[in-house]
């Protein structure tokens, strides 16, 4: 930690200009920073920026947007070159905005500065070439920097382990074994309330059900695509998808799937009474707390990906990289100073300062290496996080470290992290993050609007039996995909995957 701070101070001292001072004796800002954050954050008074100024002697004038629509409009003005700031922070730049602003000369290529002025970030990018690829335009430039989160974040299979225990069942490891477990959940009164009120498996829509497709080797993204060994393909027309949908129809017919799954939402299925009997055997969600009271969290554990053909694979929904969090415009003088400034957020010390604040002020370390907040959780939520950190709100550049969060004293939080990590070794990003040309992006949007809603509707009909799965109906389904441009979609994406 000391070495990171010392290095940062040394670099900035070499680059530091004479400090300008306003007439009132107030420090004049060195750079103009602009970006988006939630209304609970005020960059002018946030202790993170104050502490960073003490460390780096860089002061900012802030233009903070707290309204998402207003920031979207402002980004359009920036793209046209109107009243440019020096730095965009928590910028939420889309791939298209990054591409277009870079092409217009609005954004500075940051890659030439990284090895010398951002060695910690550069080391991360060298260790993970896919991270570097994700922020690199086709011309080789990198006008934006990422947020890199080591924390697990995915739509997972949360199974009621208390029910498994009540019914003396083992964790299922295949689709067939899961079917047997769901039948036991339906028949065995596992919540012990004497009523047949159990919902063996709850979900929201075909989008969420598709995460079960891994049990048949399927892990397509929202474009229904995946890439293996540089070849882009779709699982939609495969025999595996037909087998998957046939299995789902079986679950539906046996009332093992939530009958409201195609029409409900979290607010409608959520159990708010802490004393109520829990009706859900398995929940497809990023967390059970979206459906059950926090007190019931301990009943659930993550079901590891089911085996298919002797292998386990699961879709990684988001991946570790969020692009477009930080950029410098052509107005920025001495960009190397801000590259050194932001590099600190990719160090251990900088990550903690951004995410949890300063040791001794916002949190403390125990002798055993665990940590806890100095204040109660209500104060943490209402004061510490919004006023002393970059946590929440817009996504900031930097790294969010898993190891530190695993040492939090709250066992509910660390237990949930441990559960979510169970599937990580099997997760795979279906497609790499790339930058599309404007022409290809437009065409893909057109094709997606034809393919995705229709495909989801047809698959849902297969599940519910509204459309029986026969050779004729399956041929019609695959023909419908082809007529809507699935092969063209694959061909466009293939140009960007090697």
Language-model-derived ranges and their functions:
Residues 3-4, 20-177, 211, 216, ...:
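Conserved N-terminal structural module of periplasmic/extracytoplasmic solute-binding proteins
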Residues 8-17:
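Bacterial N-terminal signal peptides
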Residues 26-29, 56-59, 81-86, 106-108, ...:
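Loop/turn elements at helix/coil->beta-strand transitions in domains of secreted/extracellular proteins
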Residues 35-36, 340, 344-464:
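Conserved small-residue motifs centered on glycine
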Residues 46-63, 162-164, 235-261, 309-314, ...:
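Extracytoplasmic/periplasmic ligand-capture domains
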Residues 97-112, 292-313:
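Ligand-binding "clamshell"
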Residues 111, 136-207, 224-273, 328-337, ...:
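Helix-loop-helix "hinge/cap" segment bordering the ligand-binding cleft or interdomain interface
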Residues 249-253, 269-288, 296-299, 306-391:
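Glycine-rich, aromatic-lined ligand/substrate-binding cores of catalytic
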């Amino acid at each position: 930690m000391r070495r990171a701070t010392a290095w940062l101070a040394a670099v900035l001292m070499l680059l530091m200009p004479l400090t300008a001072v306003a007439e009132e004796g107030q420090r004049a800002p060195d750079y103009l920073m602009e970006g988006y954050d939630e209304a609970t954050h005020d960059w002018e008074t946030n202790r993170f920026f104050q502490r960073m100024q003490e460390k780096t002697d860089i002061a900012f004038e802030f233009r903070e947007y707290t309204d998402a629509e207003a920031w979207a409009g402002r980004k359009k003005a920036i793209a046209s070159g109107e009243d440019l700031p020096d730095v965009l922070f928590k910028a939420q730049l889309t791939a298209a905005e990054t591409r277009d602003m870079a092409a217009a000369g609005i954004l500075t290529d940051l890659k030439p500065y990284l090895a010398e002025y951002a060695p910690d970030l550069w080391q991360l990018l060298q260790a993970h070439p896919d991270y570097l690829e994700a922020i690199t335009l086709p011309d080789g430039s990198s006008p934006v920097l990422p947020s890199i989160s080591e924390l697990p974040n995915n739509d997972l299979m949360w199974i009621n382990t208390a029910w498994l225990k009540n019914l003396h069942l083992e964790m299922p490891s295949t689709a067939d074994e899961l079917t047997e477990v769901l039948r036991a959940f339906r028949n065995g009164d596992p919540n012990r309330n004497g009523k047949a009120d159990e919902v063996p498996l709850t979900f929201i829509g075909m989008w969420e059900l598709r995460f079960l497709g891994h049990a048949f080797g399927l892990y397509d993204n929202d474009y229904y695509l995946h890439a293996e060994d540089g070849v882009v393909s779709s699982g939609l027309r495969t025999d595996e998808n037909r087998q998957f949908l046939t299995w789902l129809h079986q679950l539906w017919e046996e009332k093992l799937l939530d009958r409201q799954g195609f029409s409900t939402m979290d607010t409608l299925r959520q159990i708010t009474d802490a004393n109520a009997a829990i009706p859900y055997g398995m929940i497809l969600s990023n967390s059970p707390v979206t459906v059950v009271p926090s007190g019931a969290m301990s009943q659930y554990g993550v079901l590891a990906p089911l085996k298919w053909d002797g292998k386990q694979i699961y879709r990684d929904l988001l991946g570790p990289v969020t692009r477009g969090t930080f950029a410098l415009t052509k107005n920025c003088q001495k960009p190397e100073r801000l590259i050194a400034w932001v590099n600190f957020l990719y160090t251990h010390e900088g990550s903690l300062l951004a995410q949890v604040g300063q040791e001794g002020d916002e949190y403390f370390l125990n002798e055993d290496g665990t940590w806890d907040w100095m204040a109660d959780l209500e104060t943490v939520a209402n004061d510490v996080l919004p006023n002393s950190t970059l946590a929440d709100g817009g996504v900031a550049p930097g790294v969010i470290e898993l190891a530190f969060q695993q040492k939090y004293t709250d066992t509910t939080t660390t237990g949930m992290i441990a559960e979510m990590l169970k599937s990580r070794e099997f997760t795979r990003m279906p497609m790499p993050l790339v930058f599309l040309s404007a022409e290809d992006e437009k065409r893909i949007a057109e094709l997606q609007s034809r393919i995705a809603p229709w495909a989801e509707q047809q698959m849902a009909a297969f599940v519910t039996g509204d459309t029986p799965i026969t050779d004729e109906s399956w041929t019609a389904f695959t023909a419908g995909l082809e007529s809507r441009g699935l092969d063209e979609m694959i061909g466009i994406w293939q140009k960007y995957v090697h």
